[in-house]
Each structure stands twice: as C-alpha cells, then as structure tokens.
Amino acid sequence: FLENGSREGLTSAELADALLVSQKVEYEDVWDLRNAGDVLESGSKGGTSTVQKVFTDNPFDEAGNLKPNIKYQTGEFKYNYETDANGRISNWNTDNLQLTERDGRLNYNSDFLGKIEGDHAGHLAGDRFGGSPELDNIVSQSQNVNLSQYKKIENQWAKAISEGKEVTVNIDIKYDGDGFRPIEFNVEYTIDGDFFSQSILN
C-alpha cells in the first residue's frame, strides 16, 4: 500500500502482494492477480477488502488455456466475457450486439474442450455478430443446440438489428462439476427494451 494507505494506481501484482501481506483477504480472492496485467479497483465489504475481477488484455496463459477468474473482451466488437475458477467461460454479454460487415466466415479453432462425438464448435457470439473464432468465444455445443435452438435465437437478434433495433445479450454458461462441456445456457436478451429469456440444455 502507499504510505497514506491508498491503493490507487497500484498494479495488479503490487496489490496482490499487499493484500496477502496485510492478510485482509483470503488467498483464493487474490487468484491470478499477478498475471492480470491491469490496475485494479479495490473496495471493502463488511470491513474486509475484496478484489474484483478485472479486464485483462490477454486471457490466455502460456499453455493456451483461458486464465481463471478473469474478465476480458474479444471479437470484432469487443464483447464482454468472464471465466470461472476453472478457466471456463461462464458469461458473455454485450449492451450493443452488432452485425459484422465482412464477407465470409472466419476459420475457427476446432480444438475446443469438453467435446463429445457429434459436438459442434459453438460460438457464443456468432460469426455474423463479429464473434471471435478462438477459444475465448467457443464452447462445445450439441448439434441440435448449435444448428437449431441457439441459432433460432440468433436469427431473432440478427433480424432485429437489421431493422435498426437495439439488442442486448447476457448469457450464463453452466457446467457439471469440473467438466468443460456446458450443460446449460441461460440466455437473457432485450430487443428495444423488451426482455426475453430462455434456458437451453446442452
């Protein structure tokens, strides 16, 4: 901490060290701060300091896996994502879903985790919405989910955007235990302020 007790402007690594030394937070709350690469915002809750997830420029570790407990932005329009303690994508959201203007689909990374026979590379933010073709936006989806249930919702979004309407999206991705194959997608979205929700089993 600074001499006056302030934490303003500290790097993630400095704050992580300070928090551990001061013993004002539990170890698991510090998670991967040394590698986050961002200046942190910190606060207090019930007299105990808390560490918020922060946006990191590079969500991947040296092995090419997503880092745990981070927020990041990716894709053509920098949509928002979060990972859980196991480095699995747990949420993606945007207040302004957009359609890409480029022609043709991007080649995507097919080495996604948790896939079983027949699974597809499920883009959380679809290619037509400028979604990333990398593992920071791809999870294992059943053929039915990818080509039918999820796609039907995406078609609604695309139609609304093409009509000049505003679309927001928030999707929580659920897993079974420590597995990397999603078991459910809890989809919430608005079209010009009208709210819709749907749960899709995978």
Give the label of every model feature segment.
Residues 1-91, 99-105, 111-113, 196-202:
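Low-complexity, glycine/serine/proline-rich disordered segments
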Residues 69-202:
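Domain-level detector of nuclease and nuclease-like folds
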